[in-house]
Amino acid sequence: STMTGNRPIVEYMTFNFSLVGIDQIINNAAKIRQMSGGQFKCPIVFRGPTASAGQLAATHSQAFESWFANTPGLKVVVPSNPYDAKGLLKSAIRDDDPVIFMESEQMYGDKGEVPEGEYTIPLGVADIKREGTAVTIVSFGTIIKEAYKAADELENEGIYVEIIDLRT
């Protein structure tokens, strides 16, 4: 489908189920551009919730970001807020290579400013969420919330923390 001009989006109920098709993701989608000498592209997005969502069995609570991030040819996206989620998803859909788009189910109820208009956020670019001078916290996804809490506590003690969100 991707090699005929389509840009499919595969949605998993949970990324744990991606393991059923991991061979096709890692050995086909991720490698087709390199195996074809650049003749073929594979613009596909695999998206769904990752990691713990609370009150789910251990088989539905695993985080596979590092597995996919260590696969040449795949791009991995894990947004930390609604604004980034929209802009990064639009970029993922437009990308000519396969993108793993993982969302924290714990954040599905989060609210934030999201413009109705068109915008994208480039893949592969981290975001400095907070400037700081004493120490830097680098994280992604739902754990960014914990980084803010830690930074707020330290700021009360006069320690200014920089927060970097990897995003992709």
Language-model segment annotations:
Residues 146-164:
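Short helix-loop-beta junction
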Residues 168:
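Glycine/proline-rich, positively charged
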Residues 1-136, 142-145, 161:
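Conserved thiamine diphosphate
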